[in-house]
From Swiss-Prot:
Natural source organism: Magnetococcus marinus (strain ATCC BAA-1437 / JCM 17883 / MC-1)
GO molecular function: DNA binding; DNA ligase (NAD+) activity; metal ion binding
Catalytic activity: NAD(+) + (deoxyribonucleotide)n-3'-hydroxyl + 5'-phospho-(deoxyribonucleotide)m = (deoxyribonucleotide)n+m + AMP + beta-nicotinamide D-nucleotide
Every BRCT domain range: 678-767
Amino acids binding NAD(+): D30, A31, E32, Y33, D34, S79, L80, E190, R213, E250, K367, K391
Amino-acid positions noted as binding Zn(2+) in the UniProt annotation, renumbered to this chain: C485, C488, C503, C509
Family: Belongs to the NAD-dependent DNA ligase family. LigA subfamily.
Name of protein: DNA ligase
Key words, A-Z: DNA damage, DNA repair, DNA replication, Ligase, Magnesium, Manganese, Metal-binding, NAD, Zinc
Keyword Hydrolase: no
Cofactors: Mg(2+); Mn(2+)
Its biological purpose: DNA ligase that catalyzes the formation of phosphodiester linkages between 5'-phosphoryl and 3'-hydroxyl groups in double-stranded DNA using NAD as a coenzyme and as the energy source for the reaction. It is essential for DNA replication and repair of damaged DNA.
Catalytic residues of the enzyme: K192 (n6-amp-lysine intermediate)
Amino acid sequence: MSASRAAELRKRLNHYAHSYHTLDTSLVSDAEYDRLFRELQSLEAADPTLISADSPTHRVGGAILEGFEKVRHRVAMLSLDNAFSAQDLVEFHRRVQEGLAESVVVEAVQHYQDEYGLSDLGALVGRPGALEGVARDVTQRLNQTLSFVEPLQPPDTKSLLSSGRKAADILRRLRLWAAEQPQRVEYVAEPKLDGLAFSLTYAEGVLVRAATRGDGQEGEDVTAHARTIQDVPLRLQGAGYPALLEVRGEVYMPLATFEKLNAEARERGEKTFANPRNAAAGSLRQLDPKITASRGLRMFCYGTGYVEGGTLADRYAEILAALKGWGLRVSPEAERVEGAQGCLAYTERLGEKRETLPYEIDGAVLKVDSQRLRERLGFVARAPRWAMAFKFPATEESTTVQAIDLQVGRTGVITPVARLEPVAVGGVTVTNATLHNFLELARKDVRVGDRVIVRRAGDVIPEVVRVIPRESHGALAVYKEPVACPVCGAPTEREGGETALRCSGGLTCRAQVKEGVKHFASRKAMNIEGLGDKLVALLMQAGLVERISDLYRLHEQRQVLVGLERLGGKSVANLLEAIEQSKAQSAARFLFGLGIRDVGVTLAGSLAAHFTSLDALMAATVEDLVGIEDVGEVVARRVVHFFAQAHHGAELAALRALGVAAAGEPWRVEPDGHGVAAAEQPLSGLSVVLTGTLAGLTREAAAVRLEGLGAKVVASVSGKTGCLVCGESAGSKLAKAQKAGVPVLDEAALEGLFRGEIPPEIQARMQG
């Protein structure tokens, strides 16, 4: 009974996991999955003989290893030749065409030799050059060629050998024929992930081994670690797979996971990873698989290696479809394209999309689609002739640190910034790079004059990765942490346990005021269109803005504004209109705009929903605030401290007197002031947490749409949470939701919520 139940649980759990992680479809609630998982764990603990290689309980990580065993690849994991320009791709396509046309000629001649015993004819073939055309169906064309050639041979075959002219004529006609074939080659194009290549071996559908690429001939056994990666099926789905199947793929770390991992390391004062590739490699090669399990690695499959006891399709695109059907994750960006122009168009599209992807890529891989044509093209040295890696501009480059400047942020954080000798990184000229904080600067020991590696990826601010070792480094001056604010001269301070160094000047510091005004006017706050960085700086230089409330006095200075550089009458009119309109913004936007430390968009909404007015919030105690969902004691103390400061009280009174609605009027219940009664909205009473990276829109955009439908978007998961919307690279919130029995929705279900399609299990949790 236990054995059959364990087998049933394994089958169901693996099916649910495949549906969730590969197909992005949740078939059961996370609470139900968790219950079945615990049941299987209990059965296996009671009877270890029930544990099988495909048990999902293996994903949590096993015992710590003493080292990695070497593994010999049965089929070498070769590298690819690189292309760096459009011309390189055109040349690659031309070489493919020539190679295929040549293979037709050589095979035709070889067949002719074998048929008639002409052992010396091959010497006349040599290696035909510059043949244009391609053999789309080699066998059919060979037959066509032979039917064309055979009438040319004389009755006495030996006389052909004595006639170089006749043999040369045959070869000429063969080459002409090959050149006249349709010029059509299909490729499959895929993103080139910047991760770690490895292989998975399945015996009768069960994962039996995983190995890193290593040197291509020999890698390391990482089977225990691969089992912890959710994208790696422990047992293949469906049927039709070979008895022994080796799958090739790339392990990578999503960008959001990488940033989170490094942020946590910085907080602990530990060494950070230079890039997601290093993070993925370091995570996979941990001796303790439990560490690997905690790192959130993902995988895409891109082909097969050794196959036994079965056959695969001729077309690579069909092989990818088969792999997906067997439960393996393949890139949704893969496309079948035709010819050089198809390859070029794909790389352009992928390049435009590169910075929106949730993982890092460094190019595209282009492979001839037909396996038969691949065999005819063969290999050269270490790489196949039928594939090419097109490389995007590098995201890391070396340059020189010319200076280290200090920036003071809205909350007083002082950030060291390296001023660099201009360098092109990823197609963008970089002149500045963050050093994050002074503890990180000291750990990397960056000095003015150093040669450094600078990294830029996606929307991430360029950063100094490391110093390039040189003898001159020791002679350079060590950069010392400042004891006073570089702008206002106030003493610097560091709160207990924090890595950030702060200016203690508060609103007496012009740098903090400038950043505070920019934040107040930003899109997610009061949304004052046209009031950006340069204009705020201009207004402060002119003495027109010294604090936030001065924005609402600018209408008194219209003539002065018109006279400012880069401002005309129309621009001033538009600016003043935008400022006037901002007076009606919602309480949530107003609170976020105040810049209270640790009060983001979501928490500002929670405070606005809980209190009836600004006066009520200002009178709240720490105990009052801690009772609100998403508010912890640290944040509560910061909110109370903010409103207790006299200069903040004076500023809020000024905003009230100047007509800013949220500063003086009772707060409305409906989200973001849309003017619709909450009870009439389809998602009224539903609290939603967003986590991970969404493919179709940002989390902020999703939050706005949900709030517009009456939902309350909160920051953390609790037993009262209505649902968790989970994108790619979800973190600890997913595990917490599963533990609390909170329904988990994918992006497709989120779109359903936007349409008012509410699943029954979520309707039951709505408190409207």
